[in-house]
């Protein structure tokens, strides 16, 4: 889960995202749809008023059910881009899984891999982002209005340099931490 303590940045556009109200505290739960257990625990938090929104993983084992629950209950969902955890939906297209596996192998190789641009993976990044956006639209009936990433990989060099996040969408930044919360190496990566 994240809170509004994490600053957000909006990708510039002519029309601002209306869903984000200034001064509103957003408590967001990540990994929505990753597994049945994660979805069920998140629903419990939502019903208690502990969270106000979710970041949805698509192409995962519980993505379909999670989307149905979110739509029926009016839960605000953004896209939780996933480049590092294997897609687990039984109907995940093989090419999408293959491109994601190439990306994951590179990004998980060493801790600084995400700050380096990988030109040989440019098409794989485009393909995997597009596939996740298309699946989000299919499941939720709308394009995502906000983005974040599993393991914060939505801020990796390929995503930023290739400008793969749509203009006008809210994007979670992960650069504000309390003193001593992160190691120097971790802060350097961010």
Language-model segment annotations:
Residues 30-32, 57-59, 80-84, 150-152, ...:
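Active-site beta-loop-alpha junctions enriched in small/polar residues
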Residues 42-48, 63-78, 94-105, 138-140, ...:
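Acidic (Asp/Glu)-rich catalytic clusters
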Residues 88-121:
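Active-site gating loops and adjacent loop-to-helix segments of metal-dependent hydrolytic enzymes
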Residues 35-62:
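A short alpha/beta connector and helix-capping loop motif
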Residues 24-28, 34, 46, 95, ...:
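C-terminal active-site subregion of NodB/CE4 polysaccharide deacetylases
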Residues 24-26, 51-55, 74-80, 144-148, ...:
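Structural preference for beta-strand elements that scaffold enzyme active sites
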Residues 3-37:
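Boundary/entry segment of secreted carbohydrate-active catalytic domains
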Residues 130-190:
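Catalytic domains of cell-wall/extracellular-matrix polysaccharide-remodeling enzymes
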């Amino acid at each position: 889960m994240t809170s509004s303590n994490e600053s957000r940045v909006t990708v510039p556009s002519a029309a601002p995202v209306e869903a984000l109200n200034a001064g509103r505290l957003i408590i967001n739960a990540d990994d929505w749809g990753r597994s049945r257990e994660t979805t069920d625990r998140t629903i419990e938090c939502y019903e208690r008023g502990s969270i106000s929104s979710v970041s949805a993983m698509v192409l995962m084992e519980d993505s379909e059910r999670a989307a149905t629950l979110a739509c029926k209950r009016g839960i605000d969902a953004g896209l939780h881009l996933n480049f590092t955890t294997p897609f687990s939906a039984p109907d995940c297209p093989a090419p999408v899984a293959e491109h994601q596996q190439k990306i994951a192998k590179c990004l998980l190789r060493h801790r600084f891999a995400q700050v380096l641009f990988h030109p040989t993976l440019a098409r794989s990044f485009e393909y995997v982002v597009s596939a996740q956006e298309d699946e989000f639209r299919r499941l939720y009936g709308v394009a995502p209005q906000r983005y974040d990433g599993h393991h914060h990989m939505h801020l990796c060099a390929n995503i930023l340099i290739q400008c793969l996040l749509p203009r006008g969408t809210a994007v979670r930044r992960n650069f504000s931490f309390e003193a001593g919360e992160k190691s120097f190496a971790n802060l350097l990566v961010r």
